[in-house]
Structure formats: C-alpha cells, structure tokens
Amino acid sequence: MATIRGIVISKQLVYDPSGARYIKVDIIEEKELPGPVAAFSAQDEQTAQLMREVMPLVTQIVRSLPFGGGKIAVPRLTLWLTDEELEMFGDVDVGDVVLISVENGEIKVKPEA
C-alpha cells in the first residue's frame, strides 16, 4: 500500500454547466527540494576536493532561502464534492492534512486524525 500525506491548498465553490454546486478541494504533497547538482568533469583532484567541501554549504544556503523553505509542492489530487459529500467526508479547510492511500485498485482519502 502506498500512502501519501497531502495538504489542502485550496477550497473553492464552483458550479457545473447545469448549475449544480460543487466544492473543489485541491491537495498537494510537499517534497524536499533536491540540492544543487554539480556537473563538472574534474581531472584535477584539488578541484574535486574543493567541490566536495563547497557543495554542502551551497545546499544549506539554497534550503535557507525564503522562497519555499526547501520544499516543493507537487499536485496530487483534486476532489469535486457536493455539499452532502463534503459533509460525509468531513469538513476540511486549507492547511489541513489528508491521507491518500492507494492499494489494490482503490484510492482512499481521509482527513488525518
């Protein structure tokens, strides 16, 4: 079984072409931002050693930058629920955590307790 820890990032009221009312719930997964990759061909051992020393510092600086906190948002699931379905699901709000489980051809979504 695969389990995804999702975060609700938006909740919007929308209408379909027939006028039926739905609540659109967008869920993302936050993943760690990969560190910078050094692409170089160093025949020189001194250059290679310098890169091994510098790369951890560069990675730390990139993760400390204010634009994302070292994480990226990966869209995972969008739900279109009626008012009744949302009530049965449990009222979720922006910032709430939901668990998405995938197993044997089934996808289960539930708010984290």
From Swiss-Prot:
Main location: cytoplasm
Pfam families, A to Z: Arcadin_1
Record keywords: Cytoplasm, Cytoskeleton
InterPro entries reported in the protein's UniProt record: Arcadin_1
Gene Ontology annotations for the cellular component aspect, listed alphabetically: cytoplasm; cytoskeleton
Annotated compartments: Cytoplasm, Cytoskeleton
Primary role: Part of an actin-like archaeal cytoskeleton.
Subunit description: Forms probably oligomers. Interacts moderately with crenactin.
Any further remark recorded for this protein: Belongs to a conserved five-gene operon within Thermoproteales denoted Arcade (actin-related cytoskeleton in Archaea involved in shape determination).
Protein's name according to its UniProt entry: Arcadin-1
Species annotation: Pyrobaculum calidifontis (strain DSM 21063 / JCM 11548 / VA1)
Gene from which the chain derives: rkd-1
